Regions:
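Phosphate/anion-contacting hairpin/loop surfaces
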Residues: 68-184, 189-192, 196, 201
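Basic, nucleic-acid-binding surfaces and adjacent catalytic neighborhoods in DNA/RNA-processing proteins
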Residues: 22-40, 53, 58, 65, ...
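Acidic, proline/glycine-enriched N-terminal capping motif
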Residues: 1-129, 267-275, 281-303
Length: 303
């Protein structure tokens, strides 16, 4: 799912192309896309884009003199945006919608069969606020506010960082990178953290989000960002299961749950202890290895 750095770079690219431009036509190809339409989506046609804003992991396009209509795009896991010259064809099932401007078309696609991307059309700031999960913008916060939100409930760090009601714009990929940078376990409990660990985590959130935003900006340059993915070669742990840690050379490990996977370094983050992978621990039960060395030995024995 595109997260804060990806969304910021999308908005950068959109500002260059549609800010101040009139939206001529909206073409919706998927019956699953439009979730709310008060006012109707057709009311956005003919209006000028006057604002672009990020709301968590959503892209908000404000139209009309006082931003009286907002188009709120939530890409979810597999949704992506593309810029095409002229009237681009929008073909289901992959094509979801097209937004036509004089200078080109913003095309919205979604891979896979699960159509989870959503478009909300709302009126004014009140309508926009109703869609805000309320998470803290860490890049606009100080340490005290961050600590208060983090410890407001006793969650694991992984859950807390990815809860949009607590923190804005952070998902599965960048939470892995943040926790590696902070050298903290994804299973550490928020109310058990020491002050220096909270300070380290705050610094890691800011550093990771800022560094990746700037990196993606450089990669995109003046082009529209087309290589939006949760798995990037420069990442330290996310998507790097069994690859060597860049700090200690231990093999990156994973925790799988539902459709998600958390990656971490057992040496840098969990003091050499392996965290139980739900799928494997059910299979191995009491034989679940406790250290990377035990895992390596078990792997050899089962070959």
């Amino acid at each position: 799912m595109p997260e804060l750095p990806d969304i910021v770079v999308y908005i950068d690219a959109l500002r260059k192309r549609i800010l101040g431009e009139r939206l001529d036509r909206v073409r919706i190809a998927s019956p699953f896309l439009l979730r709310t339409a008060t006012p109707p989506v057709g009311d956005a046609e003919g209006k000028t884009v006057v604002q672009l804003r990020r709301l968590g992991k959503r892209i908000c396009i404000g139209l009309g003199g006082d931003s009286d209509i907002w188009l709120v795009l939530h890409l979810m896991i597999a949704g992506r945006l593309h810029w095409r010259k002229g009237d681009a064809k929008v073909s289901p099932p992959r094509g979801l919608a097209a937004f036509d401007f004089a200078g080109g078309t913003l095309l919205w696609t979604e891979a896979g069969s699960q159509k989870r991307a959503s478009l909300h059309v709302v009126a004014g700031e009140d309508g926009l606020s109703a869609l805000d999960p309320g998470g803290l913008e860490v890049l606009e916060s100080d340490l005290g506010r961050f600590a208060a939100v983090l410890t407001s409930a006793n969650h694991t760090l992984k859950r807390a960082l990815t809860d949009p009601r607590l923190f804005s714009g952070i998902g599965n990929a960048y939470s892995d990178e943040i926790l590696f940078e902070a050298q903290l376990s994804p299973f550490a409990l928020t109310q058990k953290l020491k002050p220096d660990q909270i300070e380290r985590l705050f610094a890691a959130v800011r550093a990771s989000l800022l560094q990746w935003t700037e990196r993606l900006r450089r990669e995109a340059g003046n082009d529209f960002p087309e290589k939006v993915t949760a798995f990037r070669p420069g990442m330290a742990v996310h998507g790097r299961y069994k690859e060597p840690c860049r700090r200690c050379q231990a093999k990156i490990q994973r925790i799988r749950y539902a459709a998600n996977e958390t990656n971490y370094c057992p040496i840098c983050q969990t003091a050499g202890r392996l965290l139980a992978d739900r799928a494997l621990s059910r299979l191995l039960r009491e034989d679940w290895p406790r250290t990377p060395e035990e895992l390596e030995l078990l792997t050899r024995e089962r070959r």
